Amino acid sequence: MSIVKVSYFSDILCIWAYIAQARIDAVKQKFGDAVQLDHRFCSVFGNTPLKIPTTWRDKGEYAGFNAHLRNVALQFPHVEVHPDIWLTTRPPSSTAAHLFMTAVLQWQQEQEGEGASEATAQIFEKVLWAFRCAFFRDCRDIARRDVQCELAQAAGADVGAIEKRIHDGTAFAALTSDYQAADRMRIEGSPSFVLNEGRQKLYGNVGFRIIEANIQELLRAPGADQASWC
């Protein structure tokens, strides 16, 4: 069976990645094991005290960004956005959450190598979604380690093993690789789907049908030397 590998870059504080989760779920439901999704992180909100006041300087700064996010959410009824987002809770960086999630992924992969249950094999995505909901829906600061540990533990992750990977530096190394890969592949922002060994990149608010068409074309003509028409 042909397998399409998709590298999926996102920033955990990006509303478009929060919205795109429904498309990720649809891809998994339609294609199953024919698609191998590789979650990776890129840095869009790495320094929010600089980014938001600068980017939104002439548009109301945090209040303007808050209004923008709430207006965006109105177009997508499958997601919820807290009315006080970025007003009462302002994570200084997405990097803290990315680091923790990278350690979660490392732990999960190790468990899979030891014959983990199907439930354990899904913990990374459960924690990732819990982080996004905690921020966008519940207005919690997911840059805080105590919040991260609480959410991970509730999802069934081994918090001690996860923190070990942060303390010994292995999670830092893997996250650095993600950021370097994003630069090397010229990832423009979050979310970005990279297919066909980097030949195809889908960036931003991309509809499921476009993602589906690209995957179907690669399944039809999987050879690495064949360029997709999509």
Task: Annotate each language-model stretch with its function.
Residues 1-7:
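Extreme N-terminal starter segment of soluble prokaryotic enzymes
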